[in-house]
């Protein structure tokens, strides 16, 4: 807890093409070594691939995928009397979104397609259809929370 109050969050500007703030966060998550232009081109090319393959609006596919990936519960380690317990807690809205974006990009990087555009397009389409690595991660997180439900009274 900071002694001098909380720092105001920086305002994130919407992306230049779709005018969407969440998409800007997604682009920032894709970005490596500060190369934002490269990250933007990867994202927009992936969106073009989604448009070609599904015929749907890529922003709708992206929002559906993100909604499907965002976790509701997670576990946090809590030390009680010399033992560590995995305590299930609800995830705040902003953290829910951040985790969803992080998992989408992380599991897209692990995919076997040749280019990053194809990987991101594939992961977004899979997540929109409730399949893929990022959805499995969400389900595993929920299973962990469900398994440790007995320790919910240790919540702080």
From Swiss-Prot:
GO terms for biological process: translation. InterPro entries: Ribosomal_uS7 (IPR000235), Ribosomal_uS7_bac/org-type (IPR005717), Ribosomal_uS7_CS (IPR020606), Ribosomal_uS7_dom (IPR023798), Ribosomal_uS7_dom_sf (IPR036823). Disulfide bonds: none annotated. It holds the Pfam family Ribosomal_S7. Keywords: Ribonucleoprotein, Ribosomal protein, RNA-binding, rRNA-binding, tRNA-binding. GO terms for molecular function: rRNA binding; structural constituent of ribosome; tRNA binding. The keyword rRNA-binding applies. It comes from the Bacteria. The keyword Repressor does not apply. GO terms for cellular component: small ribosomal subunit. CDD domains: uS7_Bacteria. Belongs to the universal ribosomal protein uS7 family. Part of the 30S ribosomal subunit. Contacts proteins S9 and S11. One of the primary rRNA binding proteins, it binds directly to 16S rRNA where it nucleates assembly of the head domain of the 30S subunit. Is located at the subunit interface close to the decoding center, probably blocks exit of the E-site tRNA. NCBIfam families: rpsG_bact. This is Small ribosomal subunit protein uS7. It comes from Desulfitobacterium hafniense (strain DSM 10664 / DCB-2). The lineage of its organism: Bacteria, Bacillati, Bacillota, Clostridia, Eubacteriales.
């Amino acid at each position: 807890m900071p002694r001098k109050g909380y720092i105001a969050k920086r305002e994130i500007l919407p992306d230049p093409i779709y005018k969407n703030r969440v998409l800007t966060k997604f682009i920032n998550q894709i970005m490596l070594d500060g190369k934002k232009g490269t990250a933007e081109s990867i994202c927009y090319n992936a969106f073009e691939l989604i448009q070609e393959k599904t015929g749907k609006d890529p922003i709708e596919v992206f929002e559906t995928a993100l909604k499907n990936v965002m976790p509701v519960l997670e576990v946090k380690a809590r030390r009680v009397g010399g033992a560590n317990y995995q305590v299930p807690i609800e995830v705040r809205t902003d953290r829910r979104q951040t985790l969803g974006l992080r998992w989408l990009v992380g599991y897209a990087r692990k995919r076997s397609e040749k280019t990053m555009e194809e990987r991101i397009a594939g992961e977004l389409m899979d997540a929109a259809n409730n399949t893929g690595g990022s959805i499995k991660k969400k389900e595993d997180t929920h299973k962990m929370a469900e398994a440790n439900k007995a320790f919910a009274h240790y919540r702080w």
